């Protein structure tokens, strides 16, 4: 594999790991989201079908999750053929209700190293508190 492909793969991996480190540290300020990033997640305010658009909205949503985030463990990374996206398998601990989400988050990254699209894949049912 040519050096530029290795470098691109390492760059994608580093961007993903910055994201997961941000979750673990409850500080997403280092995550390189593009200003017009599009993020889809099952627990997003409008659900999976309606994406959050824009870095400010994404930051605000992640900050709302901080109180229930527990241990974060990155397991492995997968790359698309043209090295424009990385998907990372991780375990994301939730403290209330206590559970572990088995997650695959996909990041599309532009040539400037900014995340332009993100899609989070997990089954959210165990993270939703039971209603009384």
Regions found by a protein language model. Name each.
Residues 26-28, 55, 112:
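Residues at or immediately preceding the N-termini of alpha-helices
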Residues 7, 50-53:
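Alpha-helix N-cap and loop-to-helix initiation/capping positions
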Residues 13, 17, 56-59, 63:
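Generic alpha-helical structural signal
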Residues 1-28, 35, 130-132:
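Short, low-complexity N-terminal intrinsically disordered segments enriched in polar/charged residues
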Residues 29-30, 78:
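Short secondary-structure boundary/capping segments
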Residues 36-51:
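A short gly/proline-enriched turn/hairpin at secondary-structure junctions
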Residues 2-7, 59-132:
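A beta-strand edge to alpha-helix "cap/lid" segment located at domain peripheries
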């Amino acid at each position: 594999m040519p050096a530029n492909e290795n470098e691109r793969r390492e760059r994608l991996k580093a961007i993903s790991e910055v994201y997961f480190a941000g979750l673990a540290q409850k500080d997403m300020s280092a995550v390189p989201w593009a200003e017009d990033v599009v993020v889809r997640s099952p627990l997003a305010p409008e659900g999976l079908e309606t994406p959050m658009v824009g870095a400010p909205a994404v930051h605000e949503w992640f900050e709302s999750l901080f109180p229930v985030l527990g241990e974060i463990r990155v397991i492995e990374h997968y790359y698309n053929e043209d090295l424009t996206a990385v998907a990372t398998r991780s375990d994301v601990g939730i403290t209330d209700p206590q559970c572990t989400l088995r997650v695959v988050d996909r990041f599309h990254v532009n040539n400037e190293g900014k995340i332009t699209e993100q899609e989070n894949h997990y089954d959210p049912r165990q993270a939703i508190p039971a209603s009384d």
